[in-house]
């Protein structure tokens, strides 16, 4: 999953190759910094021109005025070793860390040779293979990934730092706090660099925060913080070096606020009317590119002839690169497979066979099996350590494997999940437990828009197992009783499994863990300690990913999820009709072919779901079945679900709310009348 420390990355020949930890002198640094700043500036000038000519679509977010901070960042990091995530205005850092100008042009042109193959545009790229994690537009959401990636690298014994970039506006997000808190609690040496250019799009910092300096927020986490002039590349570079040295001696996060500039609008379409002419004129006087050029001449670190020669060569090369990128073919349009899921050869595992295991014990057995067979595995969540998790499914694991593998995290589901995503990119294999499936809604962005899209836009796996104790029946009310399988099964890129038996639970967790994609396993809480079954796992992971058949029949096909499988079995046992009961088991990507064949045979379909009609997957199952066998149906398909209402608390209300065996039997009788 991760490259070895010290791996070489090709940097454009016009750019410097010197790297930390050997700190450059100011005299050696400034000429190199100017090269990177100037190159970034002229690349963006070309991109703006291509945008106005209609070749670049979407937009162009410019780093004009931010080049000094970006260069200080890029010159401080070791490509392929340190973990980072950059933002809109950090083109110079991207170039210093391995992106070629050609790749940048291809990315903005969204052609067939772009780093994302045209699946993403403009600033949404990176290089996760080399620990440069690509940003998403939801500001703040990449911070926790850098924390997790840095933690995972150091867990492997690597001398690694993290550097996470955020803007002044992004510091208002909850993820900013969650990431800093996790890094502080776990002593992860990540430098949080705040690029403060005084405006978040058009919102001034006076409407963004009240404190004098954003670096003052470090005091609340018990860490260090500084604020510096971000238009001075040497000051940025040398300060980062000093902070890394402090982190080397005492691993802990820190905040560095760089007061930088945005000498243009938020993006190319923004005319920046909200900044006064006088203010913009003052900012232009601080433009770091011409100012560093003048400094080189004043201090005799370069002469006019050398600078002019470099600038002429750079302009010519960038012009040539832009023309070459314009000639590249457009991306191929897929005919079927859009490349949403990563694939690979799955290992053959040791078999597991045991008699009469409770579903909850099957969870514990699966987690123990994972931790025992793979040293990369770590469990993350709330109260999963000494307490053994809310439903005791992690009982004994902390004692057996230690607190560095079964890890209690600070409360904050989005930050925890982002931490896990980053760790998964740097060699760890996290298992995340949400205490209740309901709490997964705290991490919608991380799951649906970061994890689910990762392979599609990066071409790099995101192996991650997420456990969701779900369902009603325990008198817990609306905030602890939801299923949410219908929510998460609607995001391509996620894999979703919903087991009903001990065998299925064990298989789902082990198969989900070894898959190369983010896998969610729903575990119905009511079944944890009320249902038992044998486990007979032969170690074949490929065989796990299939719908499950419980009874064969000729009169009716009944599809049920989770706890409803057991209610359906009870109903069919009582009614004495020939009913075929199926659990799709794999809800995303939904494999429904055997169920379609069953309906083709029986001519009738009943879907039973605990989720309400609006939230469940019953409608989708019926739609897909009808699309294939409409002519074979003897009766219109039916759904039995909970009412479209939150899960009620009182036992009498909850009992009436949940479908049960009696109501299922009544539906079967009606459909077979």
Put a short name on every predicted segment:
Residues 475-559:
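Phosphate/diphosphate-binding glycine-rich loops and adjacent basic-rich segments that engage nucleotide
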Residues 51-55, 121-136, 159-164, 198, ...:
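Glycine/charged-rich beta-loop-alpha catalytic/anionic-binding loops adjacent to active sites
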Residues 45-49, 53-186, 204-210, 215, ...:
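Cofactor-binding active-site loop characterized by glycine-rich and histidine/acidic residues
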Residues 62, 84-87, 116-118, 125, ...:
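General beta-strand structural signal in soluble alpha/beta enzymes
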Residues 71, 130-323, 385-463, ...:
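Thiamine diphosphate
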Residues 1-69, 75, 258, 263-401, ...:
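Conserved acidic/glycine
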